[in-house]
Swiss-Prot record:
Residues where substrate binds: S43, D130, N142
Biological-process GO terms, alphabetical: L-proline biosynthetic process
EC number: 2.7.2.11
InterPro entries according to UniProt: AceGlu_kinase-like_sf (IPR036393), Asp/Glu/Uridylate_kinase (IPR001048), G5K_ProB (IPR041739), Glu/AcGlu_kinase (IPR001057), Glu_5kinase (IPR011529), Glu_5kinase/COase_Synthase (IPR005715), Glutamate_5-kinase_CS (IPR019797), PUA (IPR002478)
Name of protein: Glutamate 5-kinase
Source species, domain of life: Bacteria
Subcellular location: Cytoplasm
Class of this enzyme: transferase
Organism: Parasynechococcus marenigrum (strain WH8102)
């Protein structure tokens, strides 16, 4: 059995939404018939809400967008319910916020619920809870959400369906010699691609940056990621049967486990700790815990046992972890004279995850 997570972007659910969803449902049903299981992460609530409310244009304020999403989410689920019922498959709605997945207990509850639905042969349809998600804590067009869901359920494959045929070295609409990219094998390749995606232009602002971020999260968790054109719903059926297409992001050879993936990607850092070179070496080479003696600066305001970003002397992020001390306690220790005896542990190695070098 292969466990798939499939993400459908907003751009694919325009026009005749019912016919489009019916096309995707046929491919999903065929996968179920082969014994595979699928989790669907679907956008589209705002657009359907705008249609239902007969709004002349997409709202611009956060409150209006949230209200449109609340109206459209029921419409979206009704379409999936009807389409999958034709194949004898039940669907279940899962709405989450970023803060849900940042809380370890709620993260585990969401994972458990999804696993139970899959055991029952139900198709979970996951979406961000747009009606209540703060603007500053949004996932980013559900790309990040799909990667976090894939990690939470231990998926084998993540498919990101969009309105482009593959990843390119630059925006092919603007750069005539943009090079198509079929495979991405290493995080360093992602670094270079993210640098291009972030340098402006329609390619950088049009959603490719969030797809690269999603690929980084999923591949670090041992999941193969496919970025492919979903404008023809039959393409999903081919991908679910194992056909190659678009761009394939290959999984890291030493994937993070469930907890370490959660530490690295689901948490939102509340502050930063800057480390000296000796502490950086100790973390990378010896797998040590972070001691107070290795910290040179603290930034932000956070309480004990909250997530922080760890950075080296050059400002580059090394990893993330749960800080056992509050920011105030760390600052007091930095301001005080060095204490006699062993240096206290600030981030334990079991609550710490480092990025690949």
């Amino acid at each position: 059995m292969t466990l798939w997570v499939v993400k459908l972007g907003t751009s694919l659910l325009r026009g005749d939404t019912a016919a489009t969803i019916a096309g995707f449902a046929a491919g999903i049903a065929a996968a179920f018939a082969r014994g595979d299981r699928v989790v669907l992460v679907s956008s589209g609530a705002v657009g359907l809400g705008c249609q239902r409310l007969q709004l002349p244009q997409r709202p611009e304020t956060v409150v209006a967008l949230q209200a449109a999403a609340a109206t459209g989410q029921g419409q979206l689920m009704a379409l999936y319910e009807r389409a999958l019922a034709n194949h004898g498959i039940a669907v279940a709605q899962i709405l989450v916020t970023r803060s849900d997945l940042a809380d370890r207990r709620r993260y585990q509850n969401a994972s458990g619920t999804l696993q139970q639905l899959l055991q029952w042969g139900v198709l979970p349809v996951v979406n961000e809870n747009d009606a209540i998600s703060p603007a500053e804590l949004r996932f980013g067009d559900n790309d990040t959400l799909s990667a976090l869901v894939a990690a939470a359920v231990g998926a084998d494959q993540l498919i990101l369906l969009t309105d482009v045929d593959r990843l390119y070295s630059a925006d092919p609409r603007l750069v005539v010699d943009a090079r198509p990219i079929s495979d991405v094998h290493h995080p360093r390749e992602l670094d270079a691609l993210e640098a291009v995606a972030g340098d402006g232009g329609r390619w950088g602002r049009g959603g490719m940056t969030t797809k690269l971020a999603a690929a980084r999260i999923a591949t670090a968790s041992g999941i193969t990621v496919h970025l492919a054109d979903g404008r023809d719903p039959r393409r999903l059926d081919a991908l679910l049967q194992g056909e190659r297409g678009g761009t394939v992001f290959h999984p890291h050879p030493e994937p993070l486990g469930n907890r370490r993936s959660w530490l690295a990607h689901a948490l939102q850092p509340q502050g930063e700790l800057t480390l000296d070179a000796g502490a950086c070496d100790a973390l990378h080479q010896r797998g040590s815990s972070l001691l107070m003696v290795g910290i040179t600066a603290v930034k932000g305001v956070f309480g004990a046992n909250q997530p922080v970003r760890l950075q080296g002397p050059d400002g580059r992020e090394l990893g993330r972890g749960l800080c056992q001390l509050s920011s105030a306690a760390v600052q007091r220790a930095l301001d005080a004279a060095p204490a006699a005896g062993p240096s206290p542990v600030v981030v334990h190695r079991d609550a710490l995850v480092l990025h690949s070098r």
